């Protein structure tokens, strides 16, 4: 009887350790899955930003062809696009682990969006430009890009929120802390003034 009791203690310890290990493993896997969802959505955000950037050379070339078009507007777009391009690819790729890089990238993209909005607003003063087929095609493509950007940013924020909520709950927060920067909190896109709704870029007036 005494010998049987002597086994109870070690067995109980083994069971407890096994349960803890299983819980830690399950929590780790859950954080990994949620983190991968954030990474995937971050890639989507970059893709739609790139799609917008690819439209800019043709847009600038088109408006430059309009007589007496205000050069400061398309020069501002070109400058803003260049600022985005100056951000090192590694900084963009690793921005989810560096809030400063994330904020810098988001700000540069917002400034590019603002410059485009100003250019398009000025374009309304040039009916002949707006009547061209190339400009109307760019209008449709740009509107689609802005809609996709707003949509993918929202999806990214949703994925980041799901990760952060899981990470910050107890005892998950303790487990996340065991792995250092592996499970850092994910940054969010912040709404900019006037960004509550997607701009309606429409030149067919």
State the predicted function of each range.
Residues 1-205:
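A helix-centric hydrophobic-segment signal that preferentially recognizes long
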């Amino acid at each position: 009887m005494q010998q049987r009791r002597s086994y109870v203690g070690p067995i109980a310890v083994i069971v407890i350790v096994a349960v803890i290990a299983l819980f830690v493993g399950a929590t780790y896997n859950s954080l990994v899955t949620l983190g991968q969802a954030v990474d995937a959505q971050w890639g989507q955000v970059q893709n739609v930003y790139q799609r917008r950037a690819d439209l800019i050379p043709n847009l600038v070339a088109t408006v430059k062809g309009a007589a007496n078009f205000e050069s400061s507007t398309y020069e501002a777009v070109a400058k803003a696009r260049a600022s985005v391009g100056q951000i090192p690819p590694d900084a963009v790729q690793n921005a989810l682990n560096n809030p400063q890089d994330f904020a810098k990238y988001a700000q540069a993209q917002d400034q590019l969006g603002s410059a485009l909005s100003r250019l398009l607003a000025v374009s309304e003063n040039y009916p002949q430009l707006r009547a061209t087929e190339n400009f109307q095609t760019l209008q449709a493509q740009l509107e689609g890009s802005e809609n996709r950007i707003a949509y993918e940013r929202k999806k990214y924020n949703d994925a980041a929120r799901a990760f952060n909520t899981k990470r910050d709950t107890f005892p998950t927060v303790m487990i996340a802390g065991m792995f250092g920067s592996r499970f850092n909190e994910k940054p969010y896109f912040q709404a900019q003034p006037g960004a509550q709704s997607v701009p309606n870029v429409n030149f067919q007036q």
